[in-house]
Amino acid sequence: DNFIESVSAERLGKVVAKKIERLEKSSGRFSAINTLDDVFKIAGQTGDFEIAETYGVDEAMAGVLDRTSQLAIAAGIDAIRDAGLPLVERFRETKTGRKLANGWALPESVGRETGVIFASAFPGVDRLIDEVSRSSRVEALREVMGELEASGDTQLATQLKERLKGTNLESDYSFSRKFLFRILSMGHTQMAQHLGALGPNTQLNAACASGSQAISIATDWINAGRCKRVLVISADDVTYRQNLEWIGSGF
């Protein structure tokens, strides 16, 4: 399956709206990006991807994970399959003593010898941008509504309320109690929990060298006898939702 799509003109327009200045290599001068012709040409974006449906990750866990962690965990599951490591069905015991199926994991003997390293430059960024953007939009609307009501223009205020009906902006913003879990870099811990990997576990950020550094550390762990194998999961998605107009613009 192909999970890569082309970037729409609408999304590229948001990059233009950032009023970026770029360096012209031929003249050595800075010039403003004002049209779609001035933004990057070679670019793609990730398509639809549902980690719970495609990879069997618990839906509650998937709802907390940021996009980068979802991609990293999916890559980790694929790596386990490619390596031919066995997975056994897990069970949890209820209060009545019954055992219920609880997903698949590495055999305990294999899991104890398996470490996990999560390498990423922008973990949690999409969740952070989304939360701040929603809060800012609702706050801006509150100010506009307040000014309209104070001016006595009840007709325009009523029209605005009608247009907002059925949208996410209709109700007041409420801070998510899961905010910290969503923005923290937790791909390594969730991967270990999902697969039952009980060896050494960490995450790192070395920008574009994150994956290479992770493999180097994994080699050191194995040579030092800390584990027999290390699952290195590395991912970033700068094209996801609002990431592109911020991180993409930075590039």
Q: Where do the language-model regions lie?
A:
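Mixed-charge, low-complexity intrinsically disordered regions
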Residues: 1, 115-120
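Phosphate/oxyanion-binding active-site loops and adjacent basic polyanion-contact surfaces
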Residues: 67-78, 180-183, 210
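ACP-dependent fatty acid/polyketide chain-elongation machinery
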Residues: 1-61, 69, 83, 134-141
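Nucleic-acid-interacting cores, centered on viral/eukaryotic replication and modification enzymes
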Residues: 19-43, 99-102, 117-118, 128, ...
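Generic structural hydrophobic/aromatic packing signal, biased to beta-strands
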Residues: 46, 116-118, 191, 251
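Acyl-thioester C-C bond-transforming condensing/cleaving domain
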Residues: 62-63, 86-91, 100-105, 123-251
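Feature captures the FAD/FMN-dependent oxidoreductase FAD-binding
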Residues: 69-109, 115
